């Protein structure tokens, strides 16, 4: 299994729609000259952005967080501000701007950007499995005792693409994975 380069990422995006919308280079500056947290193609990965749609966790109902019986009322929706404030020691969910179509022979690993990590904000994303497609649900944990800010439409994490020497017998699509084709911020599904 080998990691794929910027050339491969560009080719797969252009010829197979692997990432839409796609940015062929690193974007570090907005059109108005303001600095951005970078996104787009890097040497051996793709820096993804989060959309301006967030679900911020609150414990107003004093519930237990149970992945088999998750209470959607534990979240407050935030959108249209261009950013999200995560309360201290809490978390928020968001989705990517980019829609992904992962080839059958590819598995991705996603890692948070150092800009956020150095501020105590951890980005968690599970692997994109072979033949999975959809918008990615992102989880941001604020590990600090202070409120933390996440910027929409700027880089939040980097996706690394690994291609296997042979295709898998059963892909995510074949087994009808429960998050196949997700379009919004998707809560846990039992």
From Swiss-Prot:
Location of the active site: 139 (proton donor/acceptor)
Classification via SUPFAM superfamilies: dUTPase-like
One family name in Pfam for this protein: DCD
Organism superkingdom: Bacteria
Any one Gene Ontology molecular-function term assigned to this protein's record: nucleotide binding
Pathway: Pyrimidine metabolism; dUMP biosynthesis; dUMP from dCTP (dUTP route): step 1/2
Family: Belongs to the dCTP deaminase family.
This protein's name: dCTP deaminase
Gene name as annotated: dcd
């Amino acid at each position: 299994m080998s990691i794929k380069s910027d050339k491969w990422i560009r080719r797969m995006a252009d010829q197979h729609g692997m990432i839409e919308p796609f940015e062929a280079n690193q974007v570090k500056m907005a059109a108005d000259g303001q600095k951005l947290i970078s996104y787009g193609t890097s040497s051996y990965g793709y820096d993804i952005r989060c959309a301006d749609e967030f679900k911020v966790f609150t414990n107003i109902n004093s519930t237990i967080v149970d992945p088999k019986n998750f209470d959607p009322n534990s979240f407050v929706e935030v959108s249209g501000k261009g950013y999200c404030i995560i309360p201290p020691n809490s978390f928020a969910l968001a989705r990517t701007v980019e829609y992904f179509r992962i080839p059958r022979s590819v598995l991705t690993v996603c890692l948070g950007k150092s800009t956020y990590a150095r501020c105590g904000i951890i980005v968690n994303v599970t692997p994109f499995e072979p033949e999975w497609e959809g918008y990615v649900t992102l989880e941001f944990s604020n590990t600090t005792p202070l409120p933390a800010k996440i910027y929409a439409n700027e880089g939040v994490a980097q996706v690394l693409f690994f291609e296997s020497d042979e295709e898998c017998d059963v892909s995510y699509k074949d087994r009808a994975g429960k998050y196949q084709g997700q379009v919004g911020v998707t809560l846990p599904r039992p």
